[in-house]
Amino acid sequence: MQTKNQFSRIIIFIAFALGLRFLIVGRVLENTEVWWLQATAIILIFYIGIGYVFRGTAKVIEETTDVLKNRTKLAGGFLQAFGTAFPDMVIGVVAALISLQVRNTDYVRAINLAIIAASTTFGSNIYNILHAVWCIYRQNLANIKHQTVLMFPFFKSAGSLKPLGEHNVKPSIKEMDGAIRVLTALTLLTAFVAISMVLFGQVKNEKIAGDLYQLIMPVGIVLFILCVSVLYYFRKSHRPQSQVKEIIEEERYYDQQGSWRIWLDLALSGIAILFTEESMVKTMEIFSHLTHIPFVVTGIVAGLIGCFGEMMVVHNFSINPKGRIGDAIVGVAMDNIVTTMGAAIVAIIGGIFLGSNSLILIFIIILTANTLLIEQISKLKNSLQNIK
């Protein structure tokens, strides 16, 4: 990214995001029944959203958070999460609000929307963690082989990872310990949600076939308080200030800007991500109606869309060895805690529901993924300790 006209580029990202949401989705996709026109619009939305907006905003988040964490002493992953996770949270809240609006007139549709809200929120947690597991696994593989490995085999364009010994700036042991602790907290929060839904949230309604479970309001309030407490506790950075000589050209640009300007760019990047994700979620809803895909599947796919921004940031931190792998890991865990906080907000307004099968599968996968990531971080920590 060029060091000039950074603000202009971010405005362009927002313009594209708004164009996707209100022009392509609002004027074309939602107002046509022509299948080839709908297919073209869907392809265009995903191509521009992922290929341009997400990639561009991920770079901005990477550049701004490294400077901000030095100035504020907040963890880079904490700042990163607030740039990428709030759009996920807002999408879940919006789905829940729509669910509440139609609950008295169309209960089945209200429950389906609430299921989308839940599966979007927790589905994004699954993808975030599994993607981070893969990134750290590939880094550990590079460390074991003592050679550069591709992020994805056979795909050079996705970047590569160098052994830690070849990194000019390395993550600290303290960062790895902090990441493990944040992930442990996330695991406990996830288990709390699952257990609470099973013990206190069973819903029986003759209009709904099968078992249904709700994250009830009192549990939502407790969960919200716990999430805020965890975010506050782990807000501080465990990494030394970035070395000036290692700050890339774009970050040097931000290093010369006022803090208000950096916060503004970070916030605007989040807005661009929000509108792009909303466009993609609406696209998936239309696609679901066309193909008769179940709503819970649509919600889980929407969760993947919702976490693309975070995944791009983690990917960039992994293939660009500037000592920010620790920030990437903490950012993933913080991102998931923020989206869990979003689930708490949705529960407070009354809109988190899951069927028994999806409830079991989603939470088992999240807990398993958390365990795998903790294992990979432990291996990465051992590699750091063995570097001379």
Question: Where on the chain are the PLM-derived regions?
Answer:
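Hydrophobic alpha-helical segments, chiefly the membrane-spanning helices
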Residues: 1-388
